A protein has these predicted regions:
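PAPS-dependent sulfotransferase catalytic domain
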Residues: 1-131
Length: 131
């Protein structure tokens, strides 16, 4: 089953991934940023490539909604609890829900003051807040 780490971009998702990855997966004494790979971004192509030709998704990105749940079902075949990062909301698009109770064990919603998000995004994008 999947536990989702979900947030608006620049809200602390990477920070929480670092904490959870260290707690659950660190086998050495020293932190290494590669451990963040233990909580991958769900939208990575490796989860969708067995289901659809990826070039089809590049020409029509919203087509991915047709494969959200099939990809999650494949992930859950292992029977293990897995964490995934996403910026997707638990919503439907053209009657296709992002996830289902059969695929999801829980959510961790990360919330940050929107004013801080704007500042963080501005620094990240190297633009002035005034713009």
């Amino acid at each position: 089953m999947i536990i989702w780490l979900t947030s608006y971009p620049k809200s602390g998702n990477t920070w929480l991934r670092a904490l959870l990855s260290t707690y659950f997966f660190l086998k050495e004494e020293e932190f290494n940023f590669n451990i963040l790979d233990e909580i991958p971004n769900f939208i990575q192509s490796r989860y969708f490539s067995p289901l659809v030709e990826l070039s089809k998704l590049k020409t029509n990105p919203l087509e991915i909604t047709n494969y959200w749940n099939a990809a999650q079902s494949r992930i859950n075949l292992s029977g293990q609890t897995k964490f995934f990062k996403t910026h997707n909301a638990c919503v439907s698009y053209k009657d296709k829900w992002f996830t289902t109770k059969e695929n999801t064990s829980g959510y961790i919603y990360i919330v940050r003051d929107p004013r801080a998000i704007v500042c963080s995004q501005a620094v990240h994008s190297n633009i002035k807040i005034e713009k």
